[in-house]
Amino acid sequence: MKLLVVAVGQRMPDWAQTAWDDYAKRFPPELKLELRAVKTEPRGSKSLETLYAAERERIEGAIAKGMRIVVLDERGTALTTKALAARLQAWQGEGDDVALVIGGPDGLDPAFKAAAHERIRLSDLTLPHAMARVLLVEQLYRAWSVNAGHPYHRE
């Protein structure tokens, strides 16, 4: 199974990249994790619709056809660790490759969000982009550890 994280925004602080790399190397070979950063559309005097369209095109270009699309959205479904572990297990059981999408500073195109298979949120708090990436990869690893009976997650 492949987990693809598509994130709008390319430059992350060193600490965020270090944290991402640390968690990414922990995943087992049967659960391939990949990060694809896509360029943020410069705001300038462009309308929000123009920004959304440009970023949506880049996001869709990064996602292989047939992947389950899960967007991170502040209004998405809140999940516990166990619920995320159950989702991960279901995706694996169905043989789905999953693209998890993190929007840019202006969020994601509303039509793209509406067309996604699922919308989840990481927190009720507003998170900086770098923190969202790190939190997502940590929670995905934690979900895997719950399913694998690995001692990383403790109740």
UniProtKB/Swiss-Prot annotation:
HAMAP family: 23SrRNA_methyltr_H (MF_00658). It comes from Variovorax paradoxus (strain S110). CDD domains: RlmH-like (cd18081). The gene is rlmH. It comes from the Bacteria. It catalyses: pseudouridine(1915) in 23S rRNA + S-adenosyl-L-methionine = N(3)-methylpseudouridine(1915) in 23S rRNA + S-adenosyl-L-homocysteine + H(+). It is found in: Cytoplasm. Pfam families: SPOUT_MTase. GO terms for molecular function: rRNA (pseudouridine-N3-)-methyltransferase activity. Specifically methylates the pseudouridine at position 1915 (m3Psi1915) in 23S rRNA. Homodimer. This is Ribosomal RNA large subunit methyltransferase H. S-adenosyl-L-methionine binds at residues 72, 103, 122-127.
